[in-house]
């Protein structure tokens, strides 16, 4: 067998759309990064596998940015998501499509994504899972910052007020202004103590601020799902 023969790798479908006649253009998450590939005969058996939250083994062919799917098989049990857990999974997928550079390996992101899907399927509380995923994604992409110290390296004061300097860190301020975080909330986030009053809502605000600059001002469609009655 040729040493250049394609090797199957683990993957999840992030998004799929019709492409030309019976094909589909599919965005995959793999340990080697986000890959885009053409899936032939998408209306057949392969098309039934090419759906979100199903662990797959996929053989990609081609050296260009747009690959071709040579082989695709199930690699485990799908995470069956319903209701807000489903919306949460779609939110994770959209985040990865928007933030993860093509063909930039991030195996830790892949592993955390798979673990988060399982936790969503088990019915675990959504907000801590989403905040943890957002935080780890930012950190793995090089956009992370400390939660227990400010941009000057000083420890976060429980009675202090802080603002986020995006991609730099937290800066203490001494005048009230919109979008601030108090020290007790930040220290609770650092310890992942979601039982602390205000910690989860503050974490949601913090992650929105941190993500906004990297989303380029375009809203996430999946966020609207949570607002529908």
UniProtKB/Swiss-Prot annotation:
A Gene Ontology biological process term: DNA recombination
Keyword field: DNA damage, DNA recombination, DNA repair
TM stretches of this protein: none
Any one of the GO CC terms: bacterial nucleoid
A Pfam family the protein falls into: RecO_C
Keyword match DNA damage: yes
Keyword Protein biosynthesis on entry: no
Domain of life the protein comes from: Bacteria
Family to which this protein belongs: Belongs to the RecO family.
Purpose: Involved in DNA repair and RecF pathway recombination.
HAMAP family, sorted: RecO
Protein name in UniProt: DNA repair protein RecO
Organism field: Pseudomonas fluorescens (strain ATCC BAA-477 / NRRL B-23932 / Pf-5)
Organism classification: Bacteria, Pseudomonadati, Pseudomonadota, Gammaproteobacteria, Pseudomonadales
Name of the gene this protein is made from: recO
């Amino acid at each position: 067998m040729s040493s250049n023969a394609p090797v199957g790798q683990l993957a999840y479908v992030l998004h799929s759309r019709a492409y030309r006649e019976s094909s589909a253009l599919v965005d995959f998450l793999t340990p080697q990064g986000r890959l885009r590939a053409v899936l032939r005969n998408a209306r057949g058996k392969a098309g039934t596998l090419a759906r979100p939250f199903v662990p797959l083994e996929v053989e990609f062919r081609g050296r260009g940015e747009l690959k071709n799917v040579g082989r695709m098989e199930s690699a485990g049990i799908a995470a069956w998501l319903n209701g807000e857990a489903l919306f949460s999974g779609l939110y994770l997928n959209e985040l990865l499509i928007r933030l993860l550079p093509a063909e930039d390996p991030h195996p830790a992101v892949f592993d955390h994504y798979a673990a988060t899907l399982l936790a969503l399927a088990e019915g675990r509380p959504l907000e801590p899972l989403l905040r943890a995923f957002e935080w780890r994604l930012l950190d793995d992409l090089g956009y992370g910052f400390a939660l227990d110290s400010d941009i000057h390296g000083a420890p976060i004061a429980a009675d202090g007020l802080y603002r986020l300097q995006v991609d730099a860190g937290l800066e203490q301020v001494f005048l009230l202004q919109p979008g601030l975080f108090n020290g007790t909330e930040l220290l609770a986030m650092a310890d992942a103590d979601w039982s602390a009053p205000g910690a989860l809502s503050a974490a949601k605000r913090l992650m929105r601020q941190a993500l906004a600059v990297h989303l380029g001002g375009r809203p996430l469609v999946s966020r609207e799902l949570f607002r529908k009655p």
